[in-house]
Amino acid sequence: MEIPLDYETLRIIWWGLLGTLLIGFALTDGYDLGVAALMPFIGKTDEERRLAINAIAPHWEGHQVWFILGGGAIFAAWPFVYAVSFSGFYLAMFLVLSALILRPVSFKYRSKRPDPAWRSRWDWALFIGGFVPALVFGVAVGNVLQGAPFRLDSNLRSFYEGSLLGLFSPFALMTGLPGLAMTVTVLL
C-alpha cells in the first residue's frame, strides 16, 4: 500500500508529530516544573527538599529534549511560523529560556554549600525557574487562542504590533494560571 505524501497528508503528519512532542514535553517536564515551582513550599526541612529534587534529578535533563525537538519540528514544518513567533515573542521567549536556564543552575549550586541561607536563595531560584515557564507557556496558549497582533507588509514580512505586557492580557493570564496549576497538581 502506497502512502500519498501530498501536502494535506504531510500537514496532518507534522501536526501529529508536533502534538506528540509538545504533549511529551508537558507530561514529562511538567512534573519537573511543578517540583521546582513548589520547592520553597513543599519541604519543611532541607532533607525533604533534597528528596523532592532527587525525585526528578535522574530524568529532568532528558525531559528538556522534548522541548528542543518541538522547536525543531516547528522550524522544519513551518519556518514562517517559527520566524514570526520567535521574532514577535522575542522578549517572552527570552524570559522563558532564562528561567529554564536558571533551573539547572539552581539544581547544581543548591548543594554546593550547607549554609541554610544559601540553599534558601537557590530554592527561590528554583521556584522562579519552575513558575515562570509554566505560567508563560499557558499565556502562550492563551495568545494562540485569542490571536496575536501580527501584520504582513507588502513583501509578506511579518511584524508583531503588540508589547510584552500586551501578551499578558486577562484572557491569556486566565489560561496561564491553569497551565501553572497543571504542573503543580501533578504532585498532589
Language model: regions and residue ranges:
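Helix-coil boundary and interhelical linker segments in multi-pass alpha-helical membrane proteins
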Residues: 1-15, 75-90, 145-155, 163-173
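Membrane-interface helix-loop-helix modules in multi-pass inner-membrane proteins
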Residues: 59-132, 148-151
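Long, contiguous internal "core" modules enriched in hydrophobic/ aromatic residues
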Residues: 109-188
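Hydrophobic alpha-helical segments
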Residues: 43-46, 75-77, 102, 186
